[in-house]
């Protein structure tokens, strides 16, 4: 079967990325590549093995050499970028990892710019709230 639309989901073993992947593979016109380093994700969140139109690749998108190979091989139509450190307290405890995530989106945008990628979908995180005044944080505390 020829797959018409190739989709990359970074962070696809996380909550949001995994839910998106599970929904997309229900439609056979999509071929989904899930890239995740499993630092916060879980293989339990991947789509069912009954679907054959997806694959999992262990990858750290913050490392250009890892994600560039995947992008080159697959020539994606769309990229959903969900790979990031998640959770306000986790990001506070790991500020260097948060800064490393900037490399991830830079890599995705740079590799997508002159490729077959038609659109990149970027989901932000709790980092948009800035330094917390109190925890837990919500829209009213910023």
Predicted segments with their positions:
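N-terminal Rossmann-like NAD(P)+-binding domain of SDR-like oxidoreductases, especially those catalyzing
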Residues: 1-142
């Amino acid at each position: 079967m020829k797959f018409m639309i190739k989709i990359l989901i970074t962070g696809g073993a996380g909550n949001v990325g995994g839910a998106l992947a599970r929904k997309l593979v229900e439609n056979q016109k999509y071929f989904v590549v899930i890239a995740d380093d499993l630092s916060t994700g879980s293989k339990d969140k991947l789509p069912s093995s009954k679907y054959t139109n997806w694959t999992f690749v262990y990858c750290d998108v913050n490392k250009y050499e890892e994600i560039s190979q995947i992008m080159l091989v697959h020539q994606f139509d769309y990229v959903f970028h969900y790979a990031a450190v998640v959770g306000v307290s986790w990001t506070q405890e790991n500020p260097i990892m948060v800064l490393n995530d900037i490399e991830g989106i830079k890599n995705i945008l740079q590799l997508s710019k002159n490729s077959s990628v038609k659109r990149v979908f970027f989901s932000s995180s709790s980092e948009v709230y800035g330094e917390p005044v109190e925890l837990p944080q919500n829209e009213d505390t910023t």
